[in-house]
Amino acid sequence: MYKVVLFDAYGTLLDVDAAAANLAATNRFPELAKLWPELASLWRSRQLNYTWLRSLSHRYAPFWQLTCDALDYAMEAFDLEDQDMRTALLDLYRELDAYQDARPALDAVYEAGLPAAVLSNGNQQMLNHAFAAAGLTDRLDSLLSVEDVGVFKPDPRVYQLGCDRYQVRAEEILFVSSNGWDAAAAGLFGFKTIWANRAGMPVERLPEYPDFIAPSLDFVAEHLSS
């Protein structure tokens, strides 16, 4: 059966919309009140697009740089020029809220006697800071970063990091992600996969389908106890 459970970080354990949502809630920047969902969505989509384009063009840069670049694009798209807003959004992104189902899912892995680890596009400094701020480090055995291979998901070298770190076969790893394309790529690599389909999106038309599809991370506990 499983020997380790790997979790994606951004969008799976950490809420990527939280920076924009939390800043909007302060009313410090009134223009964000209605705009923040669109800003957060474009910021995230550009962030991911930049990972794919940089991987394809062999131009790796730390995920933090791509996060900043994506925010600059999104702000310009919405005619937002306030540098204080930019600084505030990035400060909040360093310390994203954990989803409410993140801690229970990690607790379930711990109670099953398995190591839980993160496998993320995030660079190591980002991950260390984010998970300390989220209060989840006590349940995480390791934080595995693509920084070690200089390429982003869905490159197979990223998923190989999990096998190398724990000296296990791919099929002995359960991988959990809220990104359908990430779950598909991990499955193609050989992991058993759970797609936490938070947004109720259609299944990606890719060569591999997730082994399990659930609306939240609550399924992790159910699956490990079955």
Q: Could you tell me what each predicted segment is?
A:
Residues M1-S45:
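Active-site neighborhood of HAD-like aspartate-dependent phosphohydrolases
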Residues M1-V5, D107, L119, N123-Q124, ...:
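Asp-based, Mg2+/Mn2+-dependent phosphohydrolase catalytic module
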Residues A20-N27, W43-Q47, T67, L89-Y93, ...:
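Hydrophobic alpha-helical core bundles mediating ligand binding, dimerization, or RNAP-core interactions
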Residues N22, L42, D69-Y73, A88, ...:
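Alpha-helical elements of Rossmann-like donor-binding domains used by nucleotide-donor carbohydrate transfer enzymes
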Residues F29-A40, F78-L89, A170:
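Short, surface-exposed acidic
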Residues S45, N49-T87:
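A metal-dependent, Asp-based hydrolase signature
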Residues Y60-Q65, D82-V118, N128, P156:
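Short, acidic loop-to-helix structural element flanking the phosphoryl-transfer center
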